[in-house]
Structures are given as structure tokens and as C-alpha cells.
């Protein structure tokens, strides 16, 4: 195929040359055309090689794009292609607005339907942990029976008693029925109006302003007038400061009385 024919097919027929130009210019233009023809031939050969390479590259890029659109489900090991939905940009101006609304309304429905096919139901136990597919779902296996709960409570009580001391164990071994009897008897004695006519000192109980029981036997005084509680064992454990304080106060008061009585009237 001649170069002139190729150029005429690709770029169209050449324009007629001006006949008024001189012959010298024509000879120079012929020489320049020969040089340009050689350059064009070289460029054509390089362009063909580049097109062949680009064609191979385009095929490889197209294959890569196809492979990117393919995704694998790890649970079922199945390959599937991504679904392409017609977007608003691909729609031509000839289509109406109603078609656009229908397509946009169908897009979320299709995606939800596809997700429901691929996803599987996840089962969880009472604590929120996932259950494997092999294990069957059984409510009785999750909920503990009453017998197991009672056994666990007995085990906890046994461990508590095992770690307790003798004094704590003695406090535990009190019958609840006796407690109720004592409470009812105390309530009856409080509510009975005839108790005011009796003179039994044992039934009168000393209480503080807050209603707490006080020590019913004689106890040493202190400068704050605080009485010991009912649980005091009667052992005096102070360093003797309170006794010295009261002795000093008595001495000061006696001196005041003596100084007043020994005064002479003038």
C-alpha cells in the first residue's frame, strides 16, 4: 500500500498546488516531502507496534477488571459476579422521569434480596455467644433446671460455712421460729397498758435518744455523759484521765465554795 494512498484515505485528498509558485520552490518542497514521507513511515511503524502492545494491555486490563468484579463466598466457596444496576448517569435523555423513579425504587429491593440469599441466620445463646451450625438449638440446654440451681446454692452455702469461725457459726445456729416468738412477745409487752402498774425492774429497758439499748448496770462516768451500750462487757479500759478530770473539777468547786463562805462582811 502506497503512502500517498494511505494518507488520502485517512486525511482526505490533497489540495491542488499553486501554479504561480516558482520551480525552485517546487524542487525544495519535493525534497522536504521526501523527508517527511520517511518520517511518517517510521512513525506509522512505531504506531502499529504501540497499538499491538496497547491491544494486549487492554485485553489484560479488561480481564483484570472482570476478575475484580468476581467475589467469593467464604462459607459456600462459590464464585459470583457483581450485579451492575443501571444508574441515573447511564440513562439517556429520551427516557422519562417515571423510568428513573422506578429504577431507583428497585435498586434497594434487589440489593436486599441478594443479601438475604447469601447471609445465614445466626443463633445465639442466653449469654449472647454465637452457636455453631452443628449444634442444635434447644432451649432446655440453655436454661438451667431448678435442681441444678438448688445444688449450686447448697454448694455456695457449704463453702461459706467452711470459711467461718466458731463465733460466726454460733450466731448462725439460731432458730428463726424463736426469733419470731421473741418479736411477738416484745410487741405485746409494749402494747399492753397494764405493764405500767407492774414494778418489775427486769422489764424496764434503758434506751438512748436514738432508741438503742444501753448498759443496765452501773458504769463509770465520763465528761460527755455518754452511757455504754448494751453489749459492753464491763471491763474498764481507759487510762484514768476521766477520773482525774472529775477529781480536779470537784477540787475547783470546793475551793470556790470555801472562798465564798470564808469571806468577811464589812
From Swiss-Prot:
GO terms for biological process: maintenance of RNA location; mRNA splicing, via spliceosome; U2-type prespliceosome assembly. Keywords: Cytoplasm, mRNA processing, mRNA splicing, Nucleus, Spliceosome. Residues 122-149 have a biased composition (Basic and acidic residues). Residues 1-37, 118-149 are annotated as: Disordered. It is found in: Cytoplasm; Nucleus. GO terms for cellular component: cytoplasm; nucleus; Prp19 complex; RES complex; spliceosomal complex; U2 snRNP. Its main location: cytoplasm. Residues 16-26 have a biased composition (Basic residues). It comes from the Eukaryota. PANTHER family: BUD13 HOMOLOG (PTHR31809:SF0). Belongs to the pre-mRNA retention and splicing (RES) complex composed of at least BUD13, IST3 and PML1. May also belong to the CWC complex (or CEF1-associated complex) composed of the U2, U5 and U6 snRNAs and at least BUD13, BUD31, BRR2, CDC40, CEF1, CLF1, CUS1, CWC2, CWC15, CWC21, CWC22, CWC23, CWC24, CWC25, CWC27, ECM2, HSH155, IST3, ISY1, LEA1, MSL1, NTC20, PRP8, PRP9, PRP11, PRP19, PRP21, PRP22, PRP45, PRP46, SLU7, SMB1, SMD1, SMD2, SMD3, SMX2, SMX3, SNT309, SNU114, SPP2, SYF1, SYF2, RSE1 and YJU2. Interacts with IST3 and PML1. Required for efficient splicing and pre-mRNA nuclear retention. May also be involved in positioning the proximal bud pole signal. Belongs to the CWC26 family. This is Pre-mRNA-splicing factor CWC26. It comes from Saccharomyces cerevisiae (strain ATCC 204508 / S288c). The gene is BUD13.
Amino acid at each position: 500500500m502506497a503512502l500517498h494512498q494511505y494518507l488520502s484515505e485517512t486525511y482526505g485528498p490533497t489540495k491542488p498546488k499553486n501554479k504561480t509558485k516558482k520551480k525552485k520552490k517546487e524542487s525544495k518542497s519535493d525534497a522536504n516531502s521526501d523527508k517527511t514521507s520517511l518520517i511518517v513511515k517510521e512513525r506509522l511503524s512505531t504506531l502499529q507496534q504501540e497499538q499491538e502492545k496497547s491491544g494486549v494491555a487492554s485485553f489484560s486490563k479488561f480481564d483484570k477488571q472482570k476478575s475484580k468484579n468476581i467475589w467469593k463466598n467464604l462459607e459456600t466457596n462459590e464464585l459470583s459476579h457483581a450485579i451492575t444496576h443501571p444508574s441515573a448517569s447511564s440513562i439517556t435523555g429520551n427516557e422519562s422521569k417515571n423510568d428513573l423513579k422506578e429504577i431507583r425504587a428497585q435498586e434497594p429491593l434487589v440489593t436486599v434480596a441478594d443479601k438475604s440469599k447469601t447471609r445465614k441466620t445466626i443463633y445465639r445463646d442466653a449469654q449472647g455467644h454465637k452457636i455453631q451450625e452443628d449444634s442444635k438449638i434447644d432451649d432446655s440446654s440453655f436454661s438451667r433446671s431448678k435442681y441444678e440451681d438448688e445444688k449450686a446454692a447448697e454448694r455456695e452455702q457449704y463453702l461459706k460455712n467452711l470459711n467461718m469461725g466458731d463465733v460466726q457459726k454460733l450466731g448462725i445456729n439460731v432458730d428463726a421460729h424463736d426469733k419470731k416468738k421473741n418479736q411477738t412477745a416484745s410487741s405485746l409487752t409494749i402494747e399492753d397498758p397494764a405493764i405500767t402498774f407492774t414494778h418489775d425492774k427486769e422489764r424496764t429497758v434503758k434506751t438512748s435518744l436514738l432508741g438503742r439499748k444501753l448498759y443496765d448496770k452501773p458504769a463509770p462516768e465520763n465528761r460527755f455523759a455518754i452511757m455504754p451500750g448494751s453489749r459492753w462487757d464491763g471491763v474498764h479500759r481507759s487510762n484514768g484521765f476521766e477520773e482525774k478530770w472529775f477529781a480536779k473539777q470537784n477540787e475547783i468547786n470546793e475551793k470556790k465554795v470555801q472562798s465564798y463562805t470564808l469571806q468577811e462582811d464589812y
